[in-house]
Design a protein with these regions (language model features):
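Conserved N-terminal entry element of GNAT/NAT acetyltransferase domains
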Residues: 1-21
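C-terminal "cap" of GNAT-fold acetyltransferases
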Residues: 141-145, 164-184
Length: 184
């Protein structure tokens, strides 16, 4: 299994809905949980909501017929600063401004365990962000997420921390930003 065995494909929201079961299975495998466990059920709910958001895009990675990883996200709507709500340290008003074409949220990037550390995540990341027309991308991680150094090595910079909502996995999240277009 090498990155050379993987093919990447771009999909919109309708196609993502058709692929939902496969996405849930890959998500569960990435985290080493059963598909019916709460973590996967919560992922399903989040994903279904995002499929219809403006600017939604999904990139899948397959080895033959097997979905080995995926990433997806959506564009923040104009005038909506909810994503940045409560971020500390507080950024400038200009930083918070959303136009509907400024910021793309990298919501999920998941790779099956057998395919981790083989370049699939980076390939998905670059394919998704390389196709974007926004000025920047953003993502949120748990404060102690093992992925943080990986994101930083890919050019992301931490801009602050936001409080989590009731029922979230974490009580707080670190927000990262990456200027687009991505260059390697």
């Amino acid at each position: 299994m090498t990155i050379n065995d993987v093919s990447l494909s771009h999909h919109g929201g309708e196609e993502a809905s058709v692929l939902l079961e496969e996405l849930c299975d890959a998500y569960a495998d990435a985290y080493g949980v059963e598909p019916g466990e709460e973590k996967t059920v919560a992922f399903r709910r989040r994903a279904e909501k995002q499929f219809s958001r403006p600017g939604f895009a999904l990139v899948t990675a397959r080895d033959g017929g097997c979905l080995v990883g995926f990433t997806f996200g959506y564009t923040l709507p104009g005038g909506d600063t909810h994503w940045w709500g409560g971020v500390q340290p507080e950024p400038t008003a200009e930083f918070l401004q959303e136009t509907g074409s400024r910021t793309w949220v990298l919501s999920e990037i998941e790779v099956r365990r057998a395919w981790q550390a083989k370049g699939v995540g980076r390939a998905l990341h670059d394919a998704a962000l390389g196709a974007r027309g926004e000025e920047r991308a953003t993502l949120a991680t748990g404060p102690d997420a093992a992925a943080q150094p990986v994101y930083e090595s890919w050019g992301w910079r931490r801009v602050g921390r936001i409080p989590g909502d009731e029922g979230d996995y974490y009580s707080a999240y670190d927000l990262f930003v990456l200027e687009l277009p991505v260059s390697r």
